UniProtKB/Swiss-Prot annotation:
Component of the MICOS complex, a large protein complex of the mitochondrial inner membrane that plays crucial roles in the maintenance of crista junctions, inner membrane architecture, and formation of contact sites to the outer membrane. It comes from Vanderwaltozyma polyspora (strain ATCC 22028 / DSM 70294 / BCRC 21397 / CBS 2163 / NBRC 10782 / NRRL Y-8283 / UCD 57-17) (Kluyveromyces polysporus). Belongs to the MICOS complex subunit Mic12 family. Pfam families: AIM5. GO terms for biological process: cristae formation. Keywords: Membrane, Mitochondrion, Mitochondrion inner membrane, Transmembrane, Transmembrane helix. The chain crosses the membrane at residues 10-26. This is MICOS complex subunit MIC12. It is a single-pass membrane protein. Component of the mitochondrial contact site and cristae organizing system (MICOS) complex.
Length: 100
């Protein structure tokens, strides 16, 4: 019985994986694969490494028009805020386990 169960589970997982691959990459000439964000990022990185595409450096002027005041924070303050937000989320989750 154990061998039949192992074979059945292996066959099921293999067929689901094969069907997913077929529907994602082969069916409709790979439409979903070609349009995926993962493929676009991979192609862009490959072009950058090969030197076919140049990396455009952006400055703050590309994002803001006119004079603006930009506030900068230290890395310590940023990490402290992230830590506090995570502690609050954890405490909220723990209290939510208590019910109503």
């Amino acid at each position: 019985m154990s061998k039949i169960w192992k074979f059945t589970s292996f066959a099921t997982i293999s067929s689901v994986a094969a069907a997913s691959l077929y529907l994602y990459a082969i069916d409709k000439n790979g439409y979903y694969y070609e349009k995926s964000k993962f493929k676009q990022v991979t192609d862009r990185v490959r072009k950058l490494i090969d030197g076919d595409e140049t990396f455009k450096y952006v400055t703050i002027d590309d994002f803001v028009s006119g004079p603006t005041q930009i506030q900068t924070r230290s890395r310590g303050e940023t990490f402290k805020d992230l830590w506090n937000a995570e502690v609050r989320r954890t405490a909220q989750w723990i209290y939510s386990l208590g019910g109503r």
